[in-house]
């Protein structure tokens, strides 16, 4: 049996078709890829966005047929917080590392202007972590945990009147960062007629506001028909339940009410089966691929442009990564040299200013010293004059005292002679 191989030469426009004379064995590549993938396991990260009490945790338990044992969240949180939990699941011989990220407190605040920012920051942070791992010299993309969000389930409150402003703003901010599938939560609370009108209203508002939600791919012939049909059912009206009831000989998930029972996996009751089929069984790999090839690549492109990297130069000619790096390095060194020269000039200028300031201070101190010397000399002169005057007064006093003593003695002698 001959095998035809299409060979593409980049320098040629036409394809060359070669024939082999025998079996080589590269037709086993798909099997090798499957075995390698099964050995490494798979990663799938889901983000659930919606107001508190819409059944996000219950739906996750129902989708993956397990109990993630999440704790209820209060309605009184002052801000939105994101909590991510990672679980190891295994079905047959396929291992899945599942991360569920919940938006705790979303939509519970009076001022909801900043509710979406925490979500956007979290998604960007996961992209940044992956980018930093890619940029390492010694990187380990296979072993590092990929925390990029592959799908965002946006839970819509079943009001029946349309989307809230917060819903539109948040989905508009996220549609270029993550695959979004809107779902109508607790769909058993509104009638089927209202539900169809509600779905149409939601799609009309999304289109009017330019919100791009995830569309199931139709380029694969094996699933094109199914995906085309399922695209028309978005947003899915879902019901989740952790309770089981017995129908015949089977236990099925359901919600029981006084007026009847809603079977979760009954497609006439809700769209849960459609969501599970599209999300897990048919398009999970497409969501993972689109996250990497579209959303992450867009983030990576913007970040590299912010760093100064580009595929073309100023003349719109192709430029390699190394050339860009060398140009950035040269610019950085020139800028560094310029900064060093600027700092040196600033230092010299400050030294000169300080020297001038010190000289001026020295001059002032010298002037003060001279003044103090003059003042001191003047005080000394005055004191000397005072001392001399005092000495003269003292001598004059002594002379007068002597004169008085002599006069007194003479007077005493005169009186003695008369007697």
Swiss-Prot record:
Pfam families per the UniProt record, alphabetical: Septin (PF00735)
GO biological process: actomyosin contractile ring organization; border follicle cell migration; cellularization; cytoskeleton-dependent cytokinesis; growth of a germarium-derived egg chamber; imaginal disc development; protein localization; regulation of cell cycle
Keyword terms, alphabetized: Cell cycle, Cell division, Cytoplasm, Cytoskeleton, GTP-binding, Mitosis, Nucleotide-binding
Location(s), subcellular: Cytoplasm; Cytoplasm, Cytoskeleton, Spindle
Domain spans labelled Septin-type G: 40-306
Region (G3 motif): 102-105
UniProt region (G1 motif), positions on chain: 50-57
Gene Ontology cellular-component annotations: cell division site; microtubule cytoskeleton; septin complex; septin ring; spindle
Record-listed GTP binding positions: 50-57, 79, 105, 186-194, 240, 255
Region annotated G4 motif, chain positions: 185-188
Role: Involved in cytokinesis.
Subunit relationships: May assemble into a multicomponent structure.
Name of the protein this chain belongs to: Septin-2
Organism this protein belongs to: Drosophila melanogaster
């Amino acid at each position: 049996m001959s095998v035809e191989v299409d060979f593409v030469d980049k320098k040629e426009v036409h394809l060359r078709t070669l024939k082999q004379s025998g079996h080589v064995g590269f037709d086993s590549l798909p099997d090798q890829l499957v075995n390698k993938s099964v050995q490494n396991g798979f990663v799938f990260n889901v983000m659930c966005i919606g107001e508190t009490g819409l059944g996000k945790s219950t739906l996750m338990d129902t989708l993956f047929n397990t109990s993630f044992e999440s704790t209820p969240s209060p309605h009184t949180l002052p801000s939105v917080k994101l909590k991510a939990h990672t679980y190891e699941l295994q079905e047959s011989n396929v291992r899945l590392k599942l991360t569920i990220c919940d938006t705790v407190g979303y939509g519970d605040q009076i001022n909801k202007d900043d509710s979406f920012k925490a979500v956007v920051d979290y998604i960007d942070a996961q992209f940044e972590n992956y980018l930093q791992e890619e940029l390492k010299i010694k990187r380990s993309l296979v072993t590092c945990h990929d925390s990029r969000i592959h799908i965002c389930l946006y839970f819509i409150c079943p009001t029946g009147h349309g989307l809230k402003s917060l819903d539109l703003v948040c989905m508009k901010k996220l549609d270029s960062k993550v695959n979004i599938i809107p779902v109508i939560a607790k769909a058993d609370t509104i009638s089927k007629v209202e539900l169809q009108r509600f779905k149409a209203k939601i799609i009309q508002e999304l289109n009017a506001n330019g919100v791009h939600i995830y569309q199931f791919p139709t380029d694969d012939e094996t699933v094109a028909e199914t995906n085309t049909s399922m695209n028309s059912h978005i947003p899915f009206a879902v019901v989740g339940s952790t309770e089981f009831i017995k129908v015949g000989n089977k236990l099925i998930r359901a919600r029981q009410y006084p007026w009847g029972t809603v079977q979760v996996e009954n497609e006439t009751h809700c769209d849960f089966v459609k969501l599970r089929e599209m999300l897990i069984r048919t398009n999970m790999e497409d969501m993972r691929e689109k996250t990497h090839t579209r959303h992450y690549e867009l983030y990576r492109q913007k970040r590299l442009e912010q760093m100064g990297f580009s595929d073309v130069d100023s003349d719109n000619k192709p430029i390699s990564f190394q050339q860009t790096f060398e140009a950035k390095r040269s610019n950085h060194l020139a800028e560094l040299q310029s900064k060093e020269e600027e700092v040196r000039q600033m230092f010299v200028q400050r030294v000169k200013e300080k020297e001038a300031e010190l000289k001026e201070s020295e001059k002032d101190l010298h002037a003060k010293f001279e003044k103090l010397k003059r003042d001191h000399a003047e005080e000394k002169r005055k004191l000397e004059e005072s001392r001399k005057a005092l000495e003269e007064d003292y001598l004059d006093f002594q002379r007068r005292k002597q004169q008085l003593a002599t006069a007194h003695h003479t007077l005493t002698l005169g009186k003695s002679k008369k007697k």
